[in-house]
A protein has these predicted regions:
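Residue-level detector of conserved, well-ordered beta-strand and adjacent loop positions
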Residues: 5, 48, 119
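Extracellular LysM carbohydrate-binding repeats and other cell-envelope/extracellular binding modules
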Residues: 1-33
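Short, conserved "active-site rim" segments that organize catalytic pockets and cofactor/ligand binding
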Residues: 35-99
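Basic/polar, cationic surfaces and motifs that engage anionic cell-wall
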Residues: 35-43, 80-93, 106-115, 120-185
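Alpha-helical scaffolding within the catalytic cores
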Residues: 30-34, 96-107
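Solvent-exposed coil/turn segments that connect beta secondary-structure elements
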Residues: 9, 21, 27-29, 50-52, ...
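Residues at or immediately flanking beta-strands
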Residues: 15, 74-76, 154
Length: 185
């Protein structure tokens, strides 16, 4: 009970109310299998949005090839929004991750060499992130940060990469809740 109270910022059992949504730590349903590779190169995580209404790893890969990116999809992971035959919150692993290649998700300095790029399908400058996608993002980030020992301060939005001139992953991305949730693990 103490752990549940701590992760939900409750100081007393009397604060619990009927119908209240609580985070229950250390519970897991079926989850995506995230391939993890022994390396020390990954020191940061950069969160993006695709700024598109729909997408999948296959369609984003094609779009990035059209832009002249020889190795296709610039992100390491993509979280789907339920379009293009995918389910809401489905985590797709990109070929760059499988091959442990540099990303192509930010133009700044050495960030593509040291940062894992995760994109959520959608435009979060126009709307909020659906809960299932948010939960998948939290699961993925917590998995990666734990395995690669990435400190919370090194988990940023694309807009927070020094020298970036973008709103990505969007003004409606729930940063405060995101930071709160990843700190719990």
């Amino acid at each position: 009970m103490a752990t549940i109270m701590r992760v939900n910022n409750l100081t007393s059992k009397t604060e619990l109310k009927k119908g209240m949504k609580l985070l229950i730590p250390n519970t897991r349903g079926p989850r995506a299998n995230i391939p993890l590779f022994p390396t020390t190169r990954w020191t940061h995580i950069v969160i993006h949005h695709t700024a598109t209404d729909q997408g999948s790893a296959y369609s984003i890969d094609g779009l990035h090839h059209q832009r002249g990116w020889e190795n296709g999809m610039g992100y390491d992971f993509l979280i789907d929004n339920g379009t293009r035959g995918k389910t809401v919150g489905q985590i797709e692993v990109g070929p760059r991750w499988i091959k442990q290649m540099d990303g192509a998700h930010t133009k700044q300095g050495d960030w593509n060499k040291k940062a894992i790029g995760i994109a959520v399908v959608g435009n979060y400058s126009e709307t909020g992130l659906p809960d299932k996608m948010f939960d998948s993002l939290i699961f993925l980030v917590v998995t990666l940060k734990g395995f690669y020992h990435i400190p919370d301060k090194n988990i940023v939005g694309h807009r927070d990469v020094p020298g970036s001139a973008t709103e990505c992953p969007g003004k409606f991305f729930p940063w405060n809740e995101f930071k709160r949730r990843i700190r719990m693990f």
